[in-house]
Structures are given as structure tokens and as C-alpha cells.
């Protein structure tokens, strides 16, 4: 392999020192693509196809250089020429192929599949503009297309192409590959992204609006196009079928190339269905097998023995149910297969709760996945128990052997080595680098002799990361923050169940408290980051309230020195990699029973933040690992919450009437906030809290405030706080996605 200087000289006829950062980025892009192109693709008879609507892969340059073992050499070579790799990386645009935890998990998983040397590819779509780019203006979220596809990028066009049949036309796909290089491995996998050459951005008008009926020109423009109308729902079905038909044809082709006669397809392929978006892969595989002469019974049997389903949510709205008439309109050739699958279920089981097509003519995608797959997994211990005992109990009673738990994980290459190099290098220095491959070795930190030195170093690393975040926000958003304040951070997509609104009510509490003369021991900066779906009005209202409070506080000289609220614009993986290493208080405050797992909680823990959370998702497992004295838990537990829903016993108006709560909620429509905001939005959200509050914000609010105040007080005992930090970092090894993927392989995939 050429040195970087030789590569740059050949490309530009210049030295590194003579190149601009833009030229160096393109050189490094092609340098790392060349290095990964020289690695052979993983082989092995059986392969996992991880099909997902989202892959939130983040910027790839540094991640790939780390995995290829080139990072340190490249950094030194650039520095010797007076260049900074971090500044070069600024040129890179983040791929907009995902949005939330689902997509980030998929990205961590394909990284770990490659790192463990397993034969497995990600399969998805190549969205040209992703979800959207978030712009914060007039204290509201505005949306514009998130253009990330420049002329030179990480995609490699493949020669593969497939015909995808719809009711009235057939579309021809193009396959692009992104190499997935595992950490220090000799081989690689790929992320296979299907696209359409006919997609045309000129049809986008006014923000992210476009003609939803012009499928040939709109199909891969956006992730999760607005489905609040009929055309939007149909477009989602077009997208999902395009993804799974291409994926299914790829699976069959690759199996045949390796010697399969298709009767033995399950020996060659396993399909992991990541949430319900790829569910149509089941009838599509059956269709393709029967079209090749395999009889229906055998085709169903083959598909059942090669598909596995991961459930990521118990929210009814997220368990997709498509009207059969919509499927008839888009993919009529799948409808007879789905009807036959449903007929077989109804012939065997009389319980209407388990049917695929319900009495309203809606097709339940998760039900099809469970009946016609061989594995169903939840993504945290609590979540899996809720599936078995509550949400999917009817299915667990039928198929107990199918259900298993796979607690989510994160890749430590991205979230420690890349995001927090100072902490990573320090851990290497005192523990060795064994944790790079065996994350449990972080536990050695607990028994490290000189705790005082470790604490001093952790303090200085955290202070450095806070200054780094402050510079980043000043540069990118024009926001000045106090790096000597406590950093309290909540970053995740905007949803009522994640309860950003509860944190906003805490902000109001703290504002009023400071106004009353109760000055905190040190300043506090509360960060929010996340996007709200354009059709999700209440989520947009929550963003509006947060931004209004930010303005009210900034304009109040009695409060501004002590409290600041920052909404990070266009939150993404890049922003997360600045925020997470700088965090003191990690906000994981979903309503108990509603967050399947969460992975932000794991990233914060690994980087030395302490968790403020409910007993929900993976918070439960964090609490078990670190002990109750090293995590801050508040709120009702999942059993209580499930019981309140079952009995319709929660009345937000009763909680609103409480002395500690009413002034906070009323402040939403106070003159001070109304002066900064939109009356309609603020009044709508105020009424929502008092009259509905479906995710029980007011139920947990007083306990949340109490525990957060305790946390702020505890922060002042730096010695005791850092003891807790050390325990959290030490115990984070369990949450490596390498562990998760090893368990998927052992229990579900059975790859060599």
C-alpha cells in the first residue's frame, strides 16, 4: 500500500502541505476505499442479510481509518505537513440513511458482524435526502432536504440490477455497495443499498414536499416520507416492497452462485428483519421460490426456517398495519400469498388477536413475521419480558421456543475510540488495549491502584471534551456555552414517550426556582437534540416550548448566568460524537415500559456520564450492572404503568392540580413564554398535558425534579461523583455490540 504522501502526489501532483482540506478529504476517501477494496469479502456457505429501512452510519472517514489500522499513521503524516485530520474530516457530509436508534443500531451491528469475521451484509435503500435537515428558526423546526450525496462518496456502483414489479409498472434498480471493514480484520462485508436511476430531485418543492404519486422519480428521495395521507401510505408500501424485492432477489442469486438448488436455501441464507418495515420479504421470497418451481408448502417451510424478526417497540403506531386494499393497489401479486398465509393461521388458531389480516382488512406485519419466522427477539431484558407477558403474549403462548432476548449494544470503535480519543488513549495506557476486542476488560479499571490519579485524569478529559463541544457549537450554530457548567443532555428523536416535555417542565421549575432566589451551586447547561416527524404536531410543539424557554432564559439577566438551554440543530451522529463525551448527566427518562432498549444510555455510560432514568429499556440492565448507588432512578415502574393503562386509571388533570405541578404547566401559557412563542402551539400543548398526557409526564414529574436536584447536589462532591463515573465506565463492556452479535449468531443465525 502506498503512503498517503505518495497517493496524494500521484493524485494531485502536490505535497500534503500544498493541498486544501477539501483535496485531502477526497484523497483520504479514495485512499481508504483503495485499502478496503484490497480486502476479500467474507465467505462461508451461510450468510446473514440484515434488512433495515435505516442505517445511520455517520461519517465514515475516521471510522474506516480506525478499522483499517491506518488512523494513527494518517494523523501523524498529516500533522507532519501542518494539517489536522479533524479539520479534514469536517469536509465530509454525514450520510443521511437513517434517523434514530433503529438506524444507529443497524450501523453498530454491521460493524460488529464484520469485526467478528461473520459473513453478513446490511440491505437497505439509498436515500438521496434522508429524513430531512432540521433548521431552527423563529423558535420552531423547519425542514429542508438533507443533500449528502456528492459526486465522490463512499458508494461503489455494482453491476447487479433487478426488475421490481408493481401493479402498473416495473422499476429497474441499481445496487450500490459501501464496504464495511471490521476492526483489524482481514476481510470485509458490505452495506447493499438499492436505488433508482430515475429518481429526480427537481420534483421537490417548498421544503421537503413533492409529488407522492410520481413513484419513478420519488421512490428513494426521502426516508419515511410523510404518511399522514393516503398517497403517503402508498408511497411507504412502494418503498418497502422495492427494498425487500431487491433484497430477496439478491439473496436467491447469491445462494445459487454458491451452489444452492433453492430447496436448501435456508442452509445458505438467514434474513434478520429489523423492525416491521422489511416484513414483505416473507411473501416476496415465497413468490420468488414458487416462480422457480418450488411448491407452495415447501416454499413456506423454507422461508419460515430462514427468517428471524427483531421487535423494537411496543408502541401500537409503530407496529405497521397496512390496509389490504393498499397492498392490492401497489403489489397485487403479493396479496394472494398473504391471504393464504392468513388462511393457514386462522385454520390453526381461533384467537383473533393472532390473525394476520384482521376484521378491518388490515395486514399486521409483525404477526406475519412471528408466524412465518423461526425467531422473535426483543432488544432488552425488560422489553422481551413485556413482549412475552403482555404485548405479544398470545404469540408467546403459541410459540414460546421462538422468543429470545438480545440486549442491544454499541460499537466501541465509534463511540469511544473515535468519539473520545483522549479517554480511549488513557484507557489503553493504564489497562492495555485488550478492551478493543474484549470490552469486558474495561472492568480492570475498578481494581486499578491509583484511583486519585485516574479521577484527576477523568476530570481533565471531561473538561477538554466540554471545551471541544463549546467550540463546535460556536462554529456551527453560533451558540456560546459555559464549559465550566454541568452538562445535562437529552438527545434522541422527539417523541412524547421519550418525554422531552418532562425535561422542559424541569427547565421551567429551575427557571422559577432561580427567579425566587435559589441560585444553583454552579451553572447548568441543558442540551436537547432531536428531530420531530413533520406530521407529528405535538412533537413539534415540544420543540417550540424548548426553544421558547431557551429564549426566555437567555433574555433574563437574573437567570442566564446560572441556567442555559440549548437545542442542538440537526442532531445526527456527528453532533452525538461531540455531545456524548462532554456529558455529565445522561437523560434516559422514557415512560417505563415504552422504550424497548435505548442505546444512547450505553454511549453516555461508556463515556463517563451518570444516568438519570426510569426503570425502562436497558436502564434496567445498567442499574443491575452498576448498582443502585451509581445510577439515579426515578418514576413509576413498568408494571404500575401497564396497570394504569389497562384500567384507564391515569388522569393527568388530577396531577396538574398538585401544588408543585400546576405553576410549571401554567407557565407554558404565561405572558413571558407567549411573548417568545406561537400562541396556538403553546396552548395546544398546554391543553394536551392537562387533558390527555398519554405518556404520563405529570405522573413522574415531581420525582424527576427531586432526583435531578439530588444529582446536581451530588455533583458537588467530586470525589464521590468520580467513583460513580469509574464504576459506569468499568461496567459498560457488557453493552458492546460485539457481544450482542455473538449472541445473535450463537442463538439465531448459526454462521460459521
Curated annotation (Swiss-Prot):
Q: Which organism is it from?
A: Streptococcus pneumoniae serotype 4 (strain ATCC BAA-334 / TIGR4)
Family matches, as InterPro entries = Glycg_phsphrylas, Glyco_trans_35, Pyridoxal_P_attach_site
Which residues, renumbered to this chain, carry the PTM N6-(pyridoxal phosphate)lysine?
603
Q: Name one GO biological process term.
A: glycogen catabolic process
Enzyme Commission number? 2.4.1.1
Q: Tell whether Glycosyltransferase is among the UniProt keywords.
A: yes
Query: Gene Ontology terms, cellular component aspect?
Result: cytoplasm
Biological role: Phosphorylase is an important allosteric enzyme in carbohydrate metabolism. Enzymes from different sources differ in their regulatory mechanisms and in their natural substrates. However, all known phosphorylases share catalytic and structural properties.
Q: Which UniProt keywords apply?
A: Allosteric enzyme, Carbohydrate metabolism, Glycosyltransferase, Pyridoxal phosphate, Transferase
Catalysis: reaction(s): [(1->4)-alpha-D-glucosyl](n) + phosphate = [(1->4)-alpha-D-glucosyl](n-1) + alpha-D-glucose 1-phosphate
The name this protein goes by in its record: Maltodextrin phosphorylase
EC class, as a word, reads transferase
Q: Which cofactor does it need?
A: pyridoxal 5'-phosphate
PANTHER family the record matches: GLYCOGEN PHOSPHORYLASE, GLYCOGEN PHOSPHORYLASE, LIVER FORM
State the Gene Ontology terms under molecular function. glycogen phosphorylase activity; pyridoxal phosphate binding
Amino acid at each position: 500500500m502506498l503512503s498517503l504522501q505518495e497517493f496524494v502526489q500521484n493524485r494531485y501532483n502536490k505535497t500534503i502541505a500544498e493541498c486544501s482540506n477539501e483535496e485531502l478529504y477526497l484523497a483520504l476517501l479514495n485512499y481508504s476505499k483503495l485499502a478496503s477494496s484490497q480486502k476479500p469479502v467474507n465467505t462461508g456457505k451461510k450468510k446473514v442479510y440484515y434488512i433495515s429501512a435505516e442505517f445511520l452510519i455517520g461519517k465514515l472517514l475516521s471510522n474506516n481509518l480506525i478499522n483499517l489500522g491506518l488512523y494513527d499513521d494518517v494523523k501523524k503524516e498529516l500533522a507532519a505537513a501542518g494539517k489536522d485530520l479533524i479539520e479534514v474530516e469536517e469536509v465530509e457530509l454525514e450520510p443521511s440513511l437513517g434517523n434514530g436508534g433503529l438506524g444507529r443500531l443497524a450501523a453498530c451491528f454491521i460493524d460488529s458482524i464484520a469485526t467478528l469475521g461473520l459473513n453478513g451484509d446490511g440491505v437497505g435503500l439509498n436515500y438521496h435526502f434522508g429524513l430531512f435537515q432540521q433548521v431552527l428558526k423563529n423558535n420552531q423546526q423547519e425542514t429542508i432536504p438533507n443533500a449528502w450525496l456528492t459526486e465522490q462518496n463512499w458508494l461503489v456502483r455494482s453491476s447487479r440490477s433487478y426488475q421490481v414489479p408493481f401493479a402498473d409498472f416495473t422499476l429497474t434498480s441499481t445496487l450500490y455497495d459501501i464496504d464495511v471493514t471490521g476492526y483489524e480484520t482481514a476481510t470485509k462485508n458490505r452495506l447493499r443499498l438499492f436505488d433508482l436511476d430515475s429518481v429526480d430531485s427537481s420534483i421537490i418543492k417548498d421544503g421537503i414536499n413533492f409529488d407522492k404519486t410520481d413513484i419513478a422519480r420519488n421512490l428513494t428521495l426521502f426516508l419515511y416520507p410523510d404518511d399522514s395521507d393516503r398517497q403517503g401510505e402508498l408511497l411507504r408500501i412502494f418503498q418497502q416492497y422495492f427494498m425487500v424485492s431487491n433484497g430477496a432477489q439478491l439473496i436467491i442469486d447469491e445462494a445459487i452462485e454458491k451452489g444452492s438448488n433453492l430447496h436448501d436455501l435456508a442452509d445458505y441464507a438467514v434474513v434478520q428483519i429489523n423492525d416491521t418495515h422489511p416484513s414483505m420479504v416473507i411473501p416476496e421470497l415465497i413468490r420468488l421460490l414458487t416462480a422457480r418451481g418450488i411448491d407452495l408448502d415447501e416454499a413456506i417451510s423454507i422461508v419460515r426456517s430462514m427468517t428471524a424478526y427483531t421487535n423494537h417497540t411496543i408502541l401500537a403506531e409503530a407496529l405497521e398495519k397496512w390496509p389490504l386494499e393498499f397492498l392490492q393497489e401497489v403489489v397485487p401479486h403479493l396479496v394472494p400469498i398473504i391471504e393464504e398465509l392468513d388462511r393457514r393461521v386462522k385454520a390453526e388458531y381461533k384467537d383473533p388477536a393472532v390473525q394476520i389480516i384482521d376484521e378491518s382488512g388490515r395486514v399486521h406485519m409483525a404477526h406475519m413475521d412471528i408466524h412465518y419466522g423461526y425467531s422473535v427477539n426483543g432488544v432488552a431484558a425488560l422489553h422481551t419480558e413485556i413482549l412475552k407477558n403482555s404485548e405479544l403474549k398470545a404469540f408467546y403462548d403459541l410459540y414460546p421456543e421462538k422468543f429470545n432476548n438480545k440486549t442491544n449494544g454499541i460499537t466501541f470503535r465509534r463511540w469511544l475510540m473515535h468519539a473520545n480519543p483522549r479517554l480511549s488513549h488513557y484507557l489503553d495506557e493504564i489497562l492495555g488495549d485488550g478492551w478493543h476486542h474484549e470490552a469486558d476488560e474495561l472492568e480492570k479499571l475498578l481494581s486499578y491502584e491509583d484511583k486519585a490519579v485516574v479521577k484527576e485524569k477523568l476530570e481533565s478529559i471531561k473538561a477538554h471534551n466540554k471545551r471541544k463541544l463549546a467550540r463546535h457549537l460556536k462554529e456551527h450554530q453560533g451558540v456560546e456555552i459555559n464549559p465550566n457548567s454541568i452538562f445535562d443532555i437529552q438527545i434522541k428523536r422527539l417523541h412524547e414517550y421519550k418525554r422531552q416535555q418532562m425535561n422542559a417542565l424541569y427547565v421551567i421549575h429551575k427557571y422559577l426556582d432561580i427567579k425566587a432566589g435559589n441560585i444553583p451551586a454552579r451553572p447548568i447547561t441543558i442540551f436537547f437534540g432531536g428531530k420531530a416527524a413533520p406530521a407529528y404536531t405535538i412533537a413539534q410543539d415540544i420543540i417550540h416550548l424548548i426553544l421558547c424557554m431557551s429564549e426566555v432564559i437567555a433574555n433574563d439577566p437574573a437567570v442566564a448566568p446560572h441556567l442555559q438551554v440549548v437545542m442542538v440543530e440537526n442532531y445526527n451522529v456527528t453532533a452525538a460524537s461531540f455531545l456524548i463525551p462532554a456529558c455529565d448527566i445522561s437523560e434516559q427518562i422514557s415512560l417505563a415500559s415504552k422504550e424497548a432498549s435505548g442505546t444512547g444510555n450505553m454511549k453516555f455510560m461508556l463515556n463517563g456520564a451518570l444516568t438519570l432514568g426510569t426503570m425502562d429499556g436497558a436502564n434496567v440492565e445498567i442499574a443491575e450492572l452498576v448498582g443502585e448507588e451509581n445510577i439515579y432512578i426515578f418514576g413509576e415502574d413498568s408494571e404500575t404503568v401497564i396497570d394504569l393503562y389497562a384500567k384507564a386509571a391515569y388522569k393527568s388533570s388530577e396531577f396538574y392540580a398538585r401544588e408543585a405541578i400546576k405553576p410549571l404547566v401554567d407557565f407554558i401559557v404565561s405572558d413571558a413564554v407567549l411573548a417568545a412563542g406561537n400562541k396556538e402551539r403553546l396552548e395546544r400543548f398546554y391543553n394536551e398535558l392537562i387533558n390527555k398526557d398519554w405518556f404520563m409526564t405529570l405522573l413522574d414529574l415531581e420525582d424527576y425534579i427531586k432526583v435531578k436536584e439530588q444529582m446536581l447536589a451530588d455533583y458537588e462532591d467530586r470525589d464521590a461523583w468520580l467513583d460513580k463515573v469509574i464504576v459506569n465506565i468499568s461496567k459498560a463492556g457488557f453493552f458492546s455490540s460485539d457481544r450482542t452479535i455473538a449472541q445473535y449468531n450463537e442463538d439465531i443465525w448459526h454462521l460459521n
